[in-house]
Amino acid sequence: MLNDLYEEIKLRKEQPKEGSYTNYLFDKGLDKILKKVGEEATEVVIAAKNDKQELIAEVSDLTYHLLVLLAEKNIPLAAIQTELKNREGKLSTTRDRKEINDL
């Protein structure tokens, strides 16, 4: 499913379709795409405090906008899949992470 969506997003970038929201994002450029990713990430955090359906909807929006970002930066979805696969089974401890303060 994600592969199909990513391919459709790339197709919109290569073959613009008038009235397409995806093309609107590409036309506005990287700053607009980044703004949308940030907005959607914030909405995911808020939705997580509410009901499951809202969270599902917001995670879906964020996922779509992240795929648009990858397409804008010409990063294949396979690169993300490879990175995740490379991390599989690796141990991580809290000491490996920087502390997040003031939440």
Curated annotation (Swiss-Prot):
Pfam short name (any one): PRA-PH
Catalysis performed (reactions): 1-(5-phospho-beta-D-ribosyl)-ATP + H2O = 1-(5-phospho-beta-D-ribosyl)-5'-AMP + diphosphate + H(+)
Domain of life where this protein originates: Bacteria
Keyword check for ATP-binding: yes
Signal peptide: none
Membrane-crossing residue ranges in chain numbering: none
Main location: cytoplasm
Localization annotation: Cytoplasm
EC supergroup of this enzyme: hydrolase
Keyword Nucleotide-binding found: yes
Keywords: Amino-acid biosynthesis, ATP-binding, Cytoplasm, Histidine biosynthesis, Hydrolase, Nucleotide-binding
GO molecular function, one term: phosphoribosyl-ATP diphosphatase activity
Record-linked SUPFAM superfamilies: all-alpha NTP pyrophosphatases (SSF101386)
UniProt record, GO biological process: L-histidine biosynthetic process
Record-linked InterPro entries: HisE, PRib-ATP_PPHydrolase-like
Gene Ontology terms: cellular component: cytoplasm
Pathway annotation from the record: Amino-acid biosynthesis; L-histidine biosynthesis; L-histidine from 5-phospho-alpha-D-ribose 1-diphosphate: step 2/9
EC identifiers of the protein: 3.6.1.31
PANTHER family listed in its UniProt record: HISTIDINE BIOSYNTHESIS BIFUNCTIONAL PROTEIN, HISTIDINE BIOSYNTHESIS BIFUNCTIONAL PROTEIN HISIE
Family: Belongs to the PRA-PH family.
Protein name per its UniProtKB record: Phosphoribosyl-ATP pyrophosphatase
Organism placement in taxonomy: Bacteria, Bacillati, Bacillota, Bacilli, Bacillales
